[in-house]
Amino acid sequence: MNGFFTGMPPARDWFYGVRTFAASMIALYIAMLMQMPRPYWAMATVYIVSSPFVGPTSSKALYRAIGTFLGAMAAVFFVPMFVQTPFLLVVVIALWTGILLFLSLHLRTANSYALMLAGYTLPLIALPVVDNPLAVWDVAEARTEEIFLGIAVAAVVGAMFWPRRLAPVFDDSVRKWFADATVYSQRFLTRNVQPEEVSSLRGGMVATFNTLELMIGQLPHEGARPQTVRNTKELRGRMIHLLPVVDALDDALYALERRTPELVGQFAPLLAATTEWLQSTTHEAPVQRWRALRDQLEALQPDAEALDDRHQLLFSNALYRLGEWIDLWQDCRSLQAAIHSESQAPWRAVYRHWRLGRLTPFLDRGLMLYSAFSTVSAIIVASVLWILLGWTDGGSAVILAAVACSFFASMDDPAPQIYRFFFWTAMSVLFASLYLFLILPNLHDFPMLVLAFAVPFIWVGTLTVQPRFYLGMLLTIVNTSSFISIQGAYDADFLSFANSNLAGPVGLLFAFIWTLIARPFGAELAAKRLTRFSWRDIVGLTQPATLAEHRRLGVQMLDRLMQHLPRLAMTGQDTGVALRELRVALNLLDLLAYAPRVLGVPRVLLDQVVAEVGEYFKACLKAGERLPAPSGLLMTLDRTRRALNGQGLQGEGETRLHLLHALSGLRLALLPGVEFVGTGELDAPLPDGAPL
């Protein structure tokens, strides 16, 4: 028996299934009591809007209401205007859907749902009434009322019975990220790096990180306090820096071990103390222990005159990179504690860097535009086929094609998900036919109807809580509710049922085939484009810009990295290459930030470094692959380092130190494992980059 119950959903999932079913029946009963023409819309809306958590339910309710209202108003406006020219009406509907879909792709939070829904609500309302345009107002009004009813019931019932907050789930995700990040950092600190393990941990950290943005957007909808929401955003803004900071530290330590083994002994006690401190921060991160570790690190930092020696510069750079990681980790842990305790006290950062700023999402507008265009063209082609075939109920095929293309437009490879949509919709037709022709004829009152729905709907609703079942179960329950088309009186005709409801799977099958033809690229194309965007941004750094523009670009590059790494892993490419390219850009940004503070030969050489790095990546763009770093660039880096050490800049201690560390970091990112070299060492073979 224990084995049997092991696979059963937990009690809280069953509570959610019962609660959602009860809400759907309440919405259905009220809609029938008010004699609404399509009460099943209210029932289906409950399942669409509901979530196990208060925040997502509230936000989906709000944004679904906004999207439905906008789409209904568009239908009332466009249908009477273009009903005499059906082909033009089709183009207008397709453009409306595509434009709003394109706008929704710019948003990565829950509010994108409002725009996407407004886009496909127009065909949902407009296409069924093209033969009777005078009914468009009635249909738009009825759909709006019934959906608003379903939204209201779902929100009220969800808030009153067994409400769950999203905050504990957010805490669990943060703990998962920290568990991976702790092991990841520990492997590099102890110099026990296993490539497969590190790659797996990196992938887990990125996947967890990418789920946090949507959750952060939901927290205000369940009443999270403003300071807590600010802290979650600060935490995410620091999490995104950890991977490049650890990668830079690893390269600095590797170069130290390879070039100056005599200095490794001085570094070892600090690494051991840092590893011990890392383990101690699992439950708390007191500032006093962080300060003691920082003091130990600062005591090892060479003085300004010693940096003329490149071995001492290597040592100093390794200390600087370790200090960055220590400060960043302290901030992350202190923010985690503040979020968990819901502290409303102002939070104080210890990791301070000019590049820290508000997260700016990177958007590949080219792919977004193409995705919207493929949706527009799918709607137009499907509509033309419907008109030419003269299929009375073919509008349902166009509607579901529009819905499917919109739902999965943001995916690199939407075809498999559209096929799942098709499969579960086809199953819903089968389930609806069983109910409509075998079960409902034997029912004579509403309580019997509730009992007939109870077992399968509660079971399926319970399974929607689990991510692996969510899409299939939600489609099954929503489509079955819609296809049964429950109204005030039983009126079922098999031919009418088959004609109207088989159109949906046909439309989805068309959307699947169309997507295979129009979007066969998958993650490979997205990864390739993201690589080229990175190179273009590095080339663009040779152009004049303000510090604020550079800060925005740096944060945007970090966001792009979080999109790039999963795609590289999915296509079997080395994720370390993308990290190095990001570090090239970040070190260039540091050079550009501090270069205006120096004059003369050092300034000329710093400008030359930036220009030559830009030329190098311009050559990579032209070649279509990452080329070996040219020897001339490496010599320029070495000359610049010597100029900073020999032009009387020792008085500009902080500026000089930042520039030297940026040069060292840039060199290591371009050529891992090697530091500043003389001309005699430039004959050594340089590592090839990953082909584009």
Model-derived segments and their meaning:
Residues 177-181, 185-188, 235-353, 590-692:
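Soluble C-terminal extramembrane regulatory/interaction domains of multi-pass membrane proteins
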Residues 1-228, 334, 338-341, 345, ...:
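A transmembrane helix-and-boundary motif of multi-pass membrane transporters/channels
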Residues 519, 523, 544-633:
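Extended, charge-rich low-complexity regions and/or helical-solenoid scaffolds
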